[in-house]
Structures are given as C-alpha cells and as structure tokens.
Amino acid sequence: MAYCGGLDWGSAEHGVCIIEHDSGKVAAQFPVPHDAAGIADLMRRLARLAPPADLPIAIERPSGLIVDALVAAGHPVVPIHPNVVKASRPRYRAAGGKSDRGDAYLLADLLRTDGHRFRRLVPCSDEIKALRALVRGRDALVAQRLVLANQLRALLDSFWPGAAAIFADIDSPIALAFVRRYPTPDSAARLAEKRIKAFMAQHSYCGRRTASELLARLRSAPPGLAGDSEADAKGELVRALAAILTALVTQIAELTSRIEHTIGELPDGQILTSFPRAGRICAAQILAELGDVRERFPAEDQLAAEAGVCPVTHQSGKRRGVVFRWACNHRLRAAITCFADNSRHSSPWAADIYQRAKGRGCDHPHAVRILARAWVRVLWRAWQDRTRYDPTRHRGSRVSTA
C-alpha cells in the first residue's frame, strides 16, 4: 500500500502524519522530539510502513537536520511553500484553527492530492552547501556589524559627536582605533595636528584628508555637555563596542577572503564571475542560493520568480493589476539586483536597459529590477549550458553597442 507523509517542523518537536495514498486515511500520527533518539525512532517507524523510496514526505522547509536525515534515509522530500500551506488551511478548517497535528495532516494530504504540482527536493553538492554556509554566515555578521556601528555612532553623538564625524565610516579600522585611543572628549583635549599625523601614519591612513582637515572635523562638531562621570561611563561603553566591532570586522575580512577563494575554485563560480562587474562576493551570494542542480529551474521564468525580479499579475474580468512580488528568495533577489546595479557601470547593454526604464518613469529600485530580469535570462542560459558569459555571443549586447 502506498503512503504519503507530512512533517510539521518545530524547534523542539516535530509533528508527523502518514496517510494512505488512495483513501486519505491516517495510518500513523505521532510527535517526534528533535534529538538523536527521536530522529532515529522516526526512521524506524517510517521503515516499518514502507520502503523509504516509496514514502515521500512533505515539509514546509527545504533544509535542516531533519530534512538531511530523511534524504539520507532515501525518502523523497517535497518542500511546500508556507504560503501554499496557509492558503490551503480553509480547505480543512472553516474556523481557521491551527495545530501541529493538523498541519502535518494537511501537508500529507496536499502531497496526496496535489503532489504533481510540487517538485521533489534534489540536494546541492557538498561544495555548494559549504559556500552557502560561508555566505550566509558572512551576511549575518555584516548585518550585526551594521547594528553595532549604528549603536556606537548613536552613543558618540550623545556625548562626543566629533569622534563620530572625524572619519567617514565609524566601523572602519582607523575609526575604531581612534575611539579606542580617545574614547572621551577629555582624552583628546591635547590632540594636535602633530599627534593626528602620527596616528595616521601608525594606522596607514589612505584617505584623502589631511591631518589639519581631520582635526577641523573633530573641533567643528557640536560640543558634548555630559558631566565627567557620565562621559567616563560612556567612554567605557565606547571602548567595549569598539573592541567588539574590531573583532567582528576582522572576522568578516577573513570570511570574505575564504569566500573569494572558494568561488574561484568552483566551476559554476567561474561562470558567474565572468559576468560584468559581478564581483566574487556578489557571485558567491548568487551561487549560494542558485545552487548547482539544473533541474531545479528548468525554465528561466522560474528562476526570475524565485529571485523576485518579475512582478505578480492579478486579473479578474476587466480589472488587471501588476504588483511587486513579495514571496521569493530574498537573499537571491538582493544578490541579483546588486549585480545588476553594478553591471550598468560596465555593460553598455545593461546601462541602456536601465536608462530606458528610468525614461519610462521607473524609480531606481524598479529600474534595477527590470535590468535584473533581463540579466536572469542570460545568467540562466549560461548556467544551464555551463559556459562563461561572452558578450560577443550575447545578441542583445551586440545590438545595443552597434
């Protein structure tokens, strides 16, 4: 007898439901603790019902330890988007209720009745998984750096604005070194042009400002009015934030170097870095989300939808609306639009598409998405054919430069 399974993921416990394919009757329903014993017990229970290859499991997320365990055991894993699950709940509960057991059954029944609409998960290679871990980890650290940098700037603005204004980026190595050395206005009271020059030389300052200009920035900022005790206390906080940011910036730089090395060694990485102004980090961000499984995107329209660079059309009768696509891979959209924005400074074809979009009244983000949609066609073709980008073979590029 054929079965279909549904697994409602949870951080501490998963809900599992197995139903008969023909009748939809529940064959088994049970919770699974998210630990080694629970996952091992799940595999034993599933094996008693049917061979792994004959028992597909539907789940809302395409990754995680439980997904890896199911794939390793030989079960076909079918990811179903949470929006699809949410839209399907009224089919099963008119009152709009929700439970883990109910969602597990819903997933299993969706797989039973609409399984032909969903694509089976095909895992990426280990190299792509490693790249994805590096890229996403770096992105998380960059986001944390921004939070801490804003916190440090706000703290300095509250009692010593000059220290936040002297260098352009508060999270640059020289700016962090400055606030560690001079965390309060009193500590910089005797700071003169000669000391600034020595500080610049010590930290290999490569900016365009002279020592006198930097000192003028420091002195022209509004004076802080904090008392001595308050200034000393906030100075300690400045040192603490600067120390954390310094370590964070160092780790981000090391991860960046590792990612740039990794993307250069991957065949698909060499394809993506061949595009104009893609850059190694941007190319790595695209490849981390794109993966190396060609069957995942059999058509370029599917990749465009996944990347969120094509709009959604709502049409009913005489009414028709085209709106922004919210449901997509936001990481992939950010990476592809970043590449598209950079490419217009190097590719005449890309610049022409962008300028024509601006001429139609599109704002900058909209024009960049239009350009990204055009690039997706080219990127998808090169990725599918496993060939590097060649502007001499790009017909659109040849026409725009003729």
Language model segments and positions:
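A detector of single, family-specific signature residues
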Residues: 1-402
